[in-house]
Every structure is written in structure tokens, then in C-alpha cells.
Amino acid sequence: MFPILETERLILREVVPQDAQNIYSYFSNDLVTKHYGMDTMTQLADAESLIQAFATNFSQQRAIRWAIERKDELGLIGTIGFNLWSKIHKRAEIGYELHPDFWRAGYTSEALNIVTEYGFNELGFTRIGAVVYPENTASNQLLLKNGFEKEGVLRNYMYQNEQAHDVNMFSKVKR
């Protein structure tokens, strides 16, 4: 069963096929994908495939991805979750994205806190990592503000649009 999480303003729930249009609306926007590590979507089928990948990865316990939805208005505004989930090593990487209309309103921070807490307390993680492009100032600051520590730079770690990119490596460990 997929866990539903709630904060003061948000419901985090399973991403479902009906979310495809909303996901496509922001992943087809270069402002979102330029810091995300994936090419910009060009058709709705790309979003449908991504949703299927989320479901497959969850069923195989390799990843979990929540839809971020505001309590005061239905409709996905972004997603957040864990990738590279290792039960043996009790760790995962967290990733997130939000539609630009909802940037700088504290939603990502709110979701990040409850998902991190869930990872430590319910999934048994002792380490949660995050990789962020150095030029993505907002995301770098978000992680630092929420208790993640910068560990260093991974050179040529990600490829996007056929170009290598360095990333900042962050982590938060269970104390």
C-alpha cells in the first residue's frame, strides 16, 4: 500500500495516470528541466511513461515518488521521492521538482521535511543524499536550510542534452 503523507498545507500521495497532464505541463518547460538532469518532454506520452516508471520502481522497492498536492486545491504541483534506494546500505537519494507557478512558496521545503522524516523513521534510512547542479542556487540553499550538508562536487556526474555536468553532493544522516 502506498503511504500518504500530510503537512499543514500539502498532501503527498501516489502519482497516478490522471496526473500526466500536470507533470507534462512543467517537464515540458525548459526552466524546470535545465536543472533536473533530464531532457525536456515533448509529448504527453513522456509523462505517462514516467508515471509508469514511478509505479514499477515502487512495486520493486527500488524507489518511491509522491505527488505533491495542495490541500486547498486538487491537482499535482510537483513530485518528491527517493531514488537509488538501497535496503542493504540503508540509504537513498532524494529528488524533487515543482511547477514554476509554485516556486518560492515553501512547498518544497514542507514536502522535503516530511519525506526525509519518513525515510529515516519508516524506511530505516541512516543516510539520505541529494545531487544538485551547482548553478541551481535555490535547490542548493533549500537543502542547506533543511539540514543537509554539502559533501563535495561530483565531476561530470550527469549528462543532459549530450553535455556532462558537475553536481554538488549533499547528505543528511540520521542522528
Write out the residue ranges for each language-model feature.
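Acyl-donor (CoA/ACP) binding surface of acyl/acetyltransferases
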Residues: 1-33, 65, 69-175
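Hydrophobic residues in alpha-helical segments
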Residues: 27, 36, 58-59
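A generic secondary-structure signal
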Residues: 53-57, 118
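Short loop/turn motifs at secondary-structure junctions and domain boundaries
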Residues: 57-61, 148
